C-alpha cells in the first residue's frame, strides 16, 4: 500500500470496459462493468475479425470513438495485484531490503555455513489467461509493468501497446507475428534482470 508501484501488474485486454465515469459512448456504457481492483486505462482498439475470428485488421482509437460497423471495440487496462512486481528492479530492491537484509542482520555470520541459501517460494509474473476460444468476449490477462511499452519500444523499435491485438488473435493471413515472440522474450528478460540477476548478485556478495 505504501509503494503501489512495487506491486505486481497485469494487462487486462477486455471487451467489457470499466465504468469509472470516463466512458463516453453509449455503447461502451451499456456493456461496462465496475472494476474489481485498482487500475489504469492503457488503450482501446477497433478490431476486425473474419468469420473464423481471425485478425483481419486493427487500429488504436480513442475512448470517444466507436468501432467501425462490423468491427469490435476492445479495451486494455493495467491492474494492480498484491504480489511484488518481479519485472521491476526497484520493487525487488525493496524486497531484498525487507527480507534478505533482515536475514543478514540476524544470521549473516552463518551465511555460507549453517545458512547456505535463502529460499523464495516460486517467484513469478502474473499467470497468463487467454481467451477460451477465438470468438470469446471475456478477458485476456498478460504480465505487464509500468514501463514495459517504453523498454519494449527501445529494444525492438515498435510499440507493444499499439499492437496488442496481435497477441490475442491469430492473423487471418496465417503469418505469425514476430511481436508475439518479442513480447515473451522481453517479459522473460525483464523478470530475469529484475529478480534473478538482482537477487543472485546480492547472494554472491553475501556468500550464499
Indicate where each model-derived feature is located.
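Anion (oxyanion) recognition and catalysis
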Residues: 200, 204
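Mature extracytoplasmic enzyme cores
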Residues: 1-181, 188-189, 193-195
Amino acid at each position: 500500500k505504501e509503494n503501489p508501484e512495487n506491486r505486481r501488474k497485469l494487462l487486462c485486454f477486455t471487451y467489457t470496459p470499466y465504468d469509472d465515469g470516463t466512458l463516453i459512448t453509449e455503447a461502451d456504457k451499456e456493456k461496462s462493468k465496475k472494476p474489481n481492483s485498482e487500475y489504469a486505462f492503457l488503450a482501446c482498439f477497433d478490431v476486425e475479425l473474419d468469420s473464423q475470428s481471425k485478425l483481419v485488421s486493427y487500429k488504436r482509437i480513442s475512448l470517444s470513438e466507436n468501432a467501425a460497423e462490423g468491427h469490435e471495440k476492445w479495451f486494455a487496462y493495467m491492474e494492480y495485484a498484491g504480489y511484488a512486481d518481479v519485472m521491476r528492479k526497484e520493487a525487488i530492491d525493496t524486497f531484498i531490503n525487507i527480507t534478505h537484509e533482515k536475514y543478514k542482520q540476524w544470521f549473516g555470520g552463518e551465511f555460507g555455513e549453517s545458512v547456505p541459501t535463502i529460499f523464495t517460494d516460486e517467484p513469478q509474473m502474473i499467470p497468463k489467461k487467454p481467451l477460451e476460444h477465438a470468438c470469446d468476449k471475456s478477458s485476456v490477462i498478460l504480465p505487464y509493468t509500468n514501463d514495459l511499452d517504453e523498454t519494449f519500444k527501445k529494444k525492438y523499435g515498435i510499440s507493444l501497446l499499439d499492437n496488442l491485438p496481435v497477441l490475442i488473435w491469430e492473423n487471418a493471413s496465417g503469418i505469425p507475428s514476430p511481436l508475439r515472440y518479442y513480447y515473451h522474450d522481453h517479459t522473460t528478460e525483464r523478470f530475469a534482470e529484475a529478480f534473478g540477476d538482482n537477487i543472485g548478485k546480492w547472494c554472491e556478495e553475501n556468500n550464499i
